[in-house]
Regions:
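Phosphate-binding/switch loop-helix module in NTP-utilizing enzymes
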Residues: 76-105
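Short beta-strand-centered segment that lines the nucleotide-binding/catalytic pocket of NTP-utilizing
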Residues: 30-44
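ATP-dependent NMP and nucleoside kinases share a basic, alpha-helical "lid"
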Residues: 94-145
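Conserved lysine of the Walker
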Residues: 16
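Hydrophobic positions on the alpha1 helix immediately C-terminal to the Walker A/P-loop
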Residues: 19
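P-loop (Walker A) phosphate-binding loop of NTP-binding proteins
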Residues: 11
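Conserved nucleotide-sensing/catalytic segment adjacent to the nucleotide-binding pocket
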Residues: 48-85
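Conserved small/polar residues in nucleotide/adenosyl-binding loops
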Residues: 184-191
C-alpha cells in the first residue's frame, strides 16, 4: 500500500489542528495523524525551570531526523513507535504511540515545511494561516484550557520566542506550500472537503 502523505503547517494557533481534524473526519479509518510536536527533543538533563525557557519554535528544538525516518518507514508499510510529548513537563514522556501505516498520513506542525527532507516526502503541502491577533487569542485559550499553562507564561513565551520565530521560520514556509488555507477568510471544512 502506497500512502499519501499530507503535510499541514502554519503558525501557532492558525487552525492547523482544526483543519487536520476535518481531514481526519473526512478520511475516517483510512487516515493516521502524526504531530511534529511529538518529536521535540528530550530535555531530561535540563531542570524544569530551564525547560520552560527553551525556544520550542526553532527548528533545532525538533528531532526532525527521526520524523523523516518514521515517514519513510510508514511509506514502506512499516509500523513506527512515535514519541509522545508532554506539554505539562516541557519534555518527551516515556510513552510511545504505535502507529501503523494507512492510505492517508496527515503530518501536522508549525515547522513542518521548514525542512526540505520533510517537504520531499509530502505529496500535498498545506499552509494554514490566520491573522496574528486571532492566532495569539487561540493560543492563549488552548494553552490555558488544554495544557494547564498560566497566562503570564504564555504571553512571555509568545513575545520572546513564538512571535519572532514565526516571522523568521514559520511564515516564510508559506511559499513552499501547494495550498494556503486562510482561517480568517475561508471556511476550512470546505477546503478540506475539496482536497
Amino acid at each position: 500500500m502506497e500512502s499519501i502523505i499530507i503535510g499541514i503547517a502554519g503558525g501557532s494557533g492558525s487552525g492547523k489542528s482544526t483543519f487536520t481534524n476535518r481531514l481526519k473526519k473526512h478520511f475516517g479509518d483510512d487516515v493516521v495523524v502524526i504531530y511534529h510536536d511529538n518529536y521535540y527533543r528530550r530535555q531530561d538533563g535540563i531542570p524544569f525551570e530551564e525547560r520552560v525557557k527553551v525556544n520550542y519554535d526553532h527548528p533545532d528544538s525538533l528531532e526532525t531526523d527521526l520524523l523523516v525516518e518514521h515517514l519513510k518507514e510508514l511509506r514502506e508499510g512499516k509500523t513506527i513507535q512515535c514519541p509522545v510529548y508532554d506539554y505539562s513537563q516541557h519534555n518527551r514522556s516515556d510513552k510511545v504511540l504505535k502507529i501503523e501505516p494507512r492510505p492517508v498520513i496527515l503530518v501536522e506542525g508549525i515547522l513542518l515545511l521548514a525542512d526540505p527532507r520533510i517537504r520531499d516526502l509530502l505529496d500535498i503541502k498545506v499552509y494554514v494561516e490566520a491573522d496574528a491577533d486571532e492566532r495569539i487569542l487561540r493560543r492563549i485559550s488552548r494553552d490555558v484550557e488544554e495544557r494547564g499553562r498560566d497566562l503570564n507564561g504564555i504571553i512571555d513565551q509568545y513575545l520572546t520566542t513564538v512571535k519572532p520565530m514565526h516571522y523568521l521560520y514559520v511564515e516564510p514556509t508559506r511559499a513552499k506550500a501547494d495550498i494556503a488555507v486562510s482561517y480568517t477568510h475561508l471556511r476550512a471544512h470546505e477546503t478540506a472537503a475539496n482536497l
